[in-house]
């Protein structure tokens, strides 16, 4: 009998995110908000909405609603791209900086706690295995297109 690896990985991501989400409750950010802010911060500046949606792994229409909410909170701005007027570039505002620092601190601290007892070499090996699984899955998608 094969182990349900896909389900195990999905559950791991779900419970890890839920733990971070619980710890970020004092910031009054939804999971969608902090995941989006975290990705904007760690991607090169001025990403387009399309690039950000791909990085997060969601559809662009879903992202637009989240970006609207973050813009209303004064945490991001969107600017029309000079090269493609249909595209919008996303920038963090100054008021987002302390929130980003708090989010990153919680994520980093939680990661350290979750990985307690696992050697850096084991973490590196796991990262390589996950990257290989992703590469295989993407290749399968391309072959079916």
UniProtKB/Swiss-Prot annotation:
DNA-binding region: 49-72
All residue ranges annotated as the HTH marR-type domain in the record: 2-135
Keyword terms, alphabetized: Activator, DNA-binding, Repressor, Transcription, Transcription regulation
Keyword match Transferase: no
Record flagged with keyword Lipid metabolism: no
InterPro entries according to UniProt: HTH_MarR-typ, MarR/SlyA-like, Tscrpt_reg_MarR-type_CS, Tscrpt_reg_SlyA, WH-like_DNA-bd_sf, WH_DNA-bd_sf
Family per record: Belongs to the SlyA family.
HAMAP family: HTH_type_SlyA
Name used for this protein in its record: Transcriptional regulator SlyA
Organism lineage string: Bacteria, Pseudomonadati, Pseudomonadota, Gammaproteobacteria, Enterobacterales
């Amino acid at each position: 009998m094969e182990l349900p690896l896909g389900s195990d990985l999905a559950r791991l991501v779900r419970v890890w995110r839920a733990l971070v989400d619980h710890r970020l409750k004092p910031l009054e950010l939804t999971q969608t908000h902090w995941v989006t802010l975290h990705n904007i911060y760690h991607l090169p500046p001025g990403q387009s909405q399309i690039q950000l949606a791909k990085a997060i792994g969601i559809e662009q229409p879903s992202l637009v609603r989240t970006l609207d909410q973050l813009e209303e909170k004064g945490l991001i701005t969107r600017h029309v791209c000079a090269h493609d007027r249909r595209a919008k570039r996303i920038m963090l505002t100054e008021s987002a900086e302390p929130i980003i620092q708090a989010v990153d601190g919680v994520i980093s601290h939680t990661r350290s706690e979750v990985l307690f007892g696992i050697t850096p070499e084991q973490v590196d090996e796991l990262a390589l295995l996950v990257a290989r699984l992703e590469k295989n899955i993407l290749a399968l998608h391309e072959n079916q297109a």
